[in-house]
């Protein structure tokens, strides 16, 4: 149990690194350094809210593998660790590459519309797939961006493989609840770790320990639009756009 939760936290760190890397690219491409230097007082709040938005993504991604980890731990079978490892490799490979792709699309959308992904994003799909492919082929640096995406995807797959091949965690003594030599002290320690882990996931999914959960108003950290645009990530903005599209569809019908 302990080592499987540790693997999940390591994979979560990879997601945070991906989102942080995209933020750096966004800042370099769209935010003047003078603007950042002139608003240093808002940086602590900006970074804190950036972490909240990114941790929400991390914790939602954690939900499925966490549930499977607890279910498999209850089975107490020798093959569960092997199955979980294979699942994590496939799951996080798909999720991380999707996050990278959505973040890249969001950067391209911002460069054209000076906004993160919004309701307008879905208009591209109304023209049909061939028109969309033609527009991308003619208006974007497909070769450079495709090569960059391929290289980053290969790097992500390599990191995932390295995480799952880390055997130092497998030697953790008597970590499993199924171990016959689990002492009372170790059981208390493991129970505490599990409770803290669950609290971390729940709070992260909510994005807040205060009265209101994380919401779009938390992106407003200054009176500068570009600094505010640094706060949300592509996944949150896509979710917001999907909600707006659903509301618009209800109004039309």
What kind of feature is each model-predicted range?
Residues 1-100:
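Membrane-anchoring hydrophobic segments
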Residues 1-6, 77-87, 164-187:
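Membrane-interfacial, low-structure loops and terminal tails that flank and connect transmembrane helices
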Residues 5-9, 83-94, 137-149, 183-188:
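Loop-to-transmembrane boundary segments
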Residues 22-53, 91-148, 169-170, 206-235:
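Membrane-interfacial interhelical loops
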Residues 64-75, 152-167, 201:
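Alpha-helical transmembrane segments
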Residues 130-132, 140-171, 175, 183-188:
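A conserved hydrophobic secondary-structure block that centers on an alpha-helix together
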Residues 180-208:
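Internal/C-terminal transmembrane anchor helices
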Residues 231-253:
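Membrane/wall-proximal cationic-aromatic binding patches
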